Amino acid sequence: MAETVEELTVAYEDGGIQTVKELDKKVLTKGAWATLIFRYQDWNKTKGEYGPDKYTIRRYQKQNGEYRQKSKFNISSKEQAKSIIDVLSAWAGDD
C-alpha cells in the first residue's frame, strides 16, 4: 500500500500486461482522508488495445502509516462525465 498520496495509483499489471493504464490523476484533498480523481483506460484483451477513457473518484484513509481505499465511484464514459460536470457546474455556479 501507499505511504503518500503521490504513490496512490489505479494502474494494475497482470501477467506482464498493464490491464489498467493510468493516464492522469488529480489530488482533490489530502490528510488522514484523501480524495483523488483518476483518468484511466482498461486493456481489451480481445482487441489487443486499450479501450476508451474512464474516470474514477477514490477515497483513501490513512491507517498505520498507509493509505487504504475506502470507497470509489466509477464514471464509465465521457458522456456520463459531461453530465456530472453539467450538474456540478449548475449547482456550484456563481451566486
PLM features: residue spans?
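Positively charged, low-complexity terminal tracts
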Residues: M1-K78, K82, D86-D95
